């Protein structure tokens, strides 16, 4: 090939002639004499010797034709250049062109290889990605959630329940799984969606019905909970419990193999679930790592698509299962299969978790089946597993079903009994092996010590009660096979009611063993069990083993849950579960009474101190009882003697707590009257300090823009007055809360006792959650901590009231320990006005906080406590304040008039009721000019779920007894409704 210049043009005369004529003209110059050709060169020296242009076109073509040496095609005539040079030039030209073509081909091939590599990498990434993140088909994963409606029919009427289909979780052979949110309750499920197009065959429909029937009948802590199912025109929806930590298969992919203690932790829970299924005559037939879901680090067995219920004498012959986990008798199919196929699968799971891969796994399914039939597997050198682990795997993977151990024998094996099983595993173990310190902290005791199966001659308590007598009889008949030990363990099904009778018959023999179990499993509850409350008719002594009495004293709700106890297979689990239900029935009462144990001890100490000081106080009490105010002196009559005592000396004694010691705790609900009777110097016009046992609001925060008012009382209670007029109050570091919900047309406050650690109905649970947030807000505040912890040191403000936590009971039940008689003090109503905010407590105490940061507390009809911003606290009679400072007198008059009428009005309670403005100024008599307030602490930030409290100067301040001063919590001089 030759390269032709783009500007090359043929002569016009040549272009217009046919090709044959042009060829003839090309040959004619070769036949002309040499002389003529030489004459042509004389005229045009620039042309080569073998080219003779036409005379007619020479002038015109010379400017349009550009010929290079590489373009010229020479005829076979003699030339001046040697022939080898011409060939070399042509070869070089051809080589250049060939080299260019090769480069282009190489570039194209490289591009193709890069594209193929990218495609392979994308495919590998998609295969390695977990199911929730893998998106095999974008068309099946819409960006916006799909709305699904369920039609609910009630008689002739019907309504639609709305669900929102969310994230794709995974898929199986016939269904896909998505997140599904119920719009009405905002509850999230894992929805298994089966298209109706796959249910056209009768066999497919019957399998789905069987799965729904079996799964909906199950209830076990290690089985995925069946919630609900419905259908529409396109799909069938099965709503299941959502497990938040994927499956054991995901752990296997990330970690390959687990430690033995981790394997025991998971396999033990799998056995519990399978034992429950077998006792209900159900075979799972698809046990594998992908069907072992994890929720809060607990195993949940799922996917009952291949499960079947076995009737009396029936052996299934359907070939089904996952190739790596399928049992040899399913492949043989001559004699059918039964419960032993699940035992085989447990052995495969055990091997896979310890070794890192299934024992019979190959690249070809047929070869895998052949190895299963021939029982060809081995243990690799690494990872190293114990002799106990190998021994258990070998015994389970026995090709003869009848020679495999049953579930009870598996748990009795040395693999489970020679070393402890962890109580729980950390979440980090999903991706990495737990540290040794974490292992040591979470280790329990060996299974043999927990169950006493080995040490107590195998007590044969491993089974559970079957649903029906016929099914239970069949399950026992199935176990009557050649291996007698295998039969006996399965035949001994456990029924708690029968077991109670057996326990009573053998009570003398097993008394010590039962005591050991109770002691081992209830060490954390010894403090609770040392009480014996006659009202509950239950003895909590550790030596009590009368299970009949324990069962009889269970609440109806706990007796309904007895089936859950029947589904456990070990003696210690039954006793512990039964004991736990007892404790749950009485936990609220125990916690309430335990709150006041320390309080009662402190009361006894106070009484002893009072007895010691009684002799010293007798004379002073006689002085107070016979006091007669005469100007600046007090005349006291004792027999025939008259003693004149200066008021200043008496005030000094009172201020130094020589007289005003804490009185015994009252059992009367009328707090102000009891205070008046118990206070030694109440017959005086006034005294310095707070009244004993007075409960007042020490701090509060405003959340009324969404929720309500939160507050802290001086007795360490935290409460809330919600915008819907419901109230709740709880003691700091307590699990008990008192919820007041007034019912229309009824008397009383509708009080309920709640356990904040348990779940409640939606509306009540919202209030419990809020009080937890309020409690956290106050307890994390430095100011609040000072307010709460001053009881032991401040005699003039709290008087050790922290120990006297609402020890008020009904007069008619003074000696009763029933928790219903304990009446916590709480905010009954509150209103704001221009100069401050007023509260009415449930004990009829009225407290008013003013903008000038002073407080007035009316604890009874005649006793008033004035707390200035700076200065000494004064408690006196109403007459004393009426005859004193006019500004204070005007405030008290306003409290007894307008505020009292509004706080005690029978109209619907309104927290935003405005009152007329009361004009006044800060009384100068109680101001202290020399001292300044403490620096302001930073306001505690709340969680994002709650709004920040609006700041107000009416918030209470910490009083320091040795320094006549308050510590501000919020200094702003403008009140915002709190």
Curated annotation (Swiss-Prot):
GO MF annotations in UniProt: ATP binding; protein serine kinase activity; protein serine/threonine kinase activity
SMART domains for this protein: S_TKc (SM00220)
Transmembrane segments: none
Coiled coil: 497-555, 592-630
Positions contributing to ATP binding: 169-177, 192
Domain Protein kinase per the UniProt entry, residue ranges: 163-416
GO cellular component, one term: centrosome
UniProt GO BP: mitotic cell cycle; mitotic spindle organization
Keyword annotations from UniProtKB, A to Z: ATP-binding, Coiled coil, Kinase, Nucleotide-binding, Repeat, Serine/threonine-protein kinase, Transferase
Catalytic activity: L-seryl-[protein] + ATP = O-phospho-L-seryl-[protein] + ADP + H(+); L-threonyl-[protein] + ATP = O-phospho-L-threonyl-[protein] + ADP + H(+)
POLO box domain boundaries: 696-780, 826-904
Region (Disordered): 19-66, 121-143, 463-554, 601-638, 798-819, 908-978
Start-end of Low complexity biased regions: 19-36, 54-64, 473-492, 500-549, 913-978
Residue ranges, compositional bias (Polar residues): 37-53
Active site location: 286
Source organism superkingdom: Eukaryota
The enzyme's E.C. designation: 2.7.11.1
Family indicated by similarity: Belongs to the protein kinase superfamily. Ser/Thr protein kinase family. CDC5/Polo subfamily.
Protein's recorded name: Probable serine/threonine-protein kinase PLK
Organism: Dictyostelium discoideum (Social amoeba)
